[in-house]
Amino acid sequence: MSAYRRPAGLNDALGRLSAEPHRIIAGGTDVFPAAAAAVGWGRPGIDHPGRAPILDITAIEALSHIRRFPDRVEIGALVTWTEAIESDLPAWFDGVRQAAREVGGRQIQNRGTLAGNLCNASPAADGVPALLALDARVRLRRRGGSRDVPLESFITGNRRTCLRPEELMTTIVIPSPAPGARSTFLKLGARRYLVISIAMVAAGLEVRDGRIRGARIAVGACSEVARRLTRLEARLEGTRPEDAPGGVREEDFASLSPLNDVRASAAYRRHGARVLVTRALGALVHGEGAAR
């Protein structure tokens, strides 16, 4: 069977990655179900001798932090959804907390990590739009160096990222917003819980002197990669918050390329995204940061 390694320190992990490619595991909530499905279809499983060795990073304590700085918040690669929900982060992170509550069941939330959700790069990953709406970037470490990559550049396609074989995502970095900024997250699915998204939306607003001074709106599950609605964001700049929900237009969604599949038609996804954006902006205007 393939090798299994569980380093206790970050340098050890980076050294192993520099020597040969590994399959990295944190919570394992995506890797193991995918491997089981592969076996069911007659393909090699996770322990097949021909597969790359497994690198389990769960013993690296340096990756289990949430740290606050004057200009940013850093979320370590081992921070779970439950830890995000229970954190004392400000209202700017309400959208992340709401997305965390939508990820699977309690067991998945206790094991799964935000960083793993980003690295899995599913078009329907709940964490991606929530973090895109916060201008998140990811820190990729390698032996002897590191680089910070904007989240919108990190995910390059359906389950594809720019992570190199010798790199490990160690941190999610979120810039600190203006005081009073809020975010929210809304999801459309075939049922209320334990569902893969048909469409989802995260939105964040910074308001000063009665005007919007920063709007960030991201849509997931409506393209191969979650996307920011930059046209709408630009138009909302300088407007009154109460006018934002009524300012959503059909052309704001031109950058999306929703699929027709067993969950929904492309037209339904696009319509659902517009409804969710309007509702999310309305929730923020009325002070409902964690709208449901």
Feature names for model-found ranges:
Residues 1-292:
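C-terminal structural segment of proteins
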